Amino acid sequence: MKSRFHEAADAELTEAVAYYDGKAAGLGDRFLVDVKAATRYIERYPEIASVIDREVRAKVLTRFPYSLMYVVEPHQLFIVAVAHQSRRPGYWVNRVPERSGG
């Protein structure tokens, strides 16, 4: 299964990479590697992560205090947020697509 990032989630990813690059050389790259590994994992096992709100699942990153918040759609995963675990919970909820008939 493939994935796509919400525009705001993509911006969060870019911001986090820049933040970690500012902390230490190469740290942003390590963050990106962790995000890519988590993305590949949920593409392979889309229902592995727990549902935390409606249909949204959270895949916690291995080495950083972030989670990928995503929805399993019929033919893809839709990543709605690259959320820092200390950030206001549910700030991304308005990014979740509406489901018809449910």
PLM features per residue range, with description:
Residues 1-32, 102:
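Arg/Lys-rich, positively charged N-terminal/basic patches that mediate binding to nucleic acids
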Residues 15, 19-22, 41-44, 48, ...:
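Conserved amphipathic alpha-helical interaction elements at protein-protein interfaces in regulatory
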Residues 29, 50-52, 91:
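Short, hydrophobic secondary-structure boundary micro-motifs
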Residues 37-62:
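A short, surface-exposed loop/turn module that caps and links secondary-structure elements
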Residues 67, 71-102:
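Enriched for short, Lys/Arg-rich terminal
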